[in-house]
């Protein structure tokens, strides 16, 4: 994993961890768990598709529905970068 992507994962997960503490519930937990899963697969050299075993990722949909405020810009950008990585990875 390159340094930029690693930093993106780190920033995204750190912000989601903060939001989980501030607003407990399923949304931030789900986003955190999915992005952490992707990062772990990439770090270990595992196939994300194989590890998903037919399940799907929806963190990008959750972010689109729940992140719209001015304070969400950096998190949205991080999630967009991770989504772009996944599109290239799968393509």
PLM region descriptions:
Residues 1-31, 83-90:
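Short terminal alpha-helical segments
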């Amino acid at each position: 994993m390159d340094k930029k992507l690693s930093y993106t994962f780190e920033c995204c997960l750190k912000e989601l961890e903060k939001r989980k503490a501030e607003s407990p519930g399923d949304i931030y937990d789900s986003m955190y768990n999915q992005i952490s899963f992707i990062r772990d697969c990439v770090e270990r050299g595992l196939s994300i598709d194989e590890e998903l075993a037919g399940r799907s990722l929806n963190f990008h949909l959750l972010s689109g529905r729940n992140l719209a405020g001015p304070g969400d810009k950096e998190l949205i950008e991080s999630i967009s970068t991770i989504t772009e990585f996944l599109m290239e990875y799968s393509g």
